[in-house]
């Protein structure tokens, strides 16, 4: 299946912005600026499952290098879109059969889901290499033509794996007197 086979007029989803979000959206659209967080959070409170709002939040946190928050939004995107595509709740259980059914429901929405899963890149940035690698491996497994570019991220990880030193976090570090 070609994940590039979609109507370019609707790259990810066809849903209009929720009407209740319209009053705060002009300020929220400035996600590349540091001032958009509050309007974006207001928009999310008004329409927590609105995909446009979730994209805005993800971009804001990503551009602000707040990767933990961006990863949480990527997870939320998976939670919101997965049921619409009839995908298993656990992304690691998705297989080619699930993807075929999901594509029939909407190839753009499927791309949106897989791009959220490609957010495993953020796990890599946060030092969660196994989690990030697992997420990216799943995207590569499902995107056999590598249309979403996850294979390159795995190649870079493999090429530099000898340089990666994993340090214990404060939560699991052994403390000695």
Curated annotation (Swiss-Prot):
<dbReference type="InterPro" id="IPR011990">
    <property type="entry name" value="TPR-like_helical_dom_sf"/>
</dbReference>
<protein>
    <recommendedName>
        <fullName>Uncharacterized 19.8 kDa protein in nifW 5'region</fullName>
    </recommendedName>
</protein>
């Amino acid at each position: 299946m070609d994940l590039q086979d979609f109507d370019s007029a609707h790259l990810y989803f066809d849903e209009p912005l929720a009407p209740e979000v319209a009053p705060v959206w002009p300020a929220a659209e400035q996600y590349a600026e540091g001032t958009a967080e509050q309007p974006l959070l207001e928009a999310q409170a008004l329409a927590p499952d609105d995909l446009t709002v979730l994209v805005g939040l993800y971009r804001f946190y990503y551009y602000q290098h707040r990767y933990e928050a961006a990863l949480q939004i990527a997870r939320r995107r998976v939670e919101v879109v997965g049921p619409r595509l009839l995908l298993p709740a656990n992304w690691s259980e998705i297989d080619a059969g699930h993807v075929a059914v999901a594509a029939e429901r909407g190839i753009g929405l499927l791309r949106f889901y897989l791009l959220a899963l490609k957010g495993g890149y953020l796990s890599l940035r946060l030092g969660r290499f196994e989690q990030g690698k697992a997420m990216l491996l799943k995207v590569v497994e499902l995107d056999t033509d590598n249309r979403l570019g996850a294979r390159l991220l795995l190649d870079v990880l493999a090429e530099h794996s000898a340089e990666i030193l994993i340090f214990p976090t404060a939560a699991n570090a052994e403390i000695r007197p």
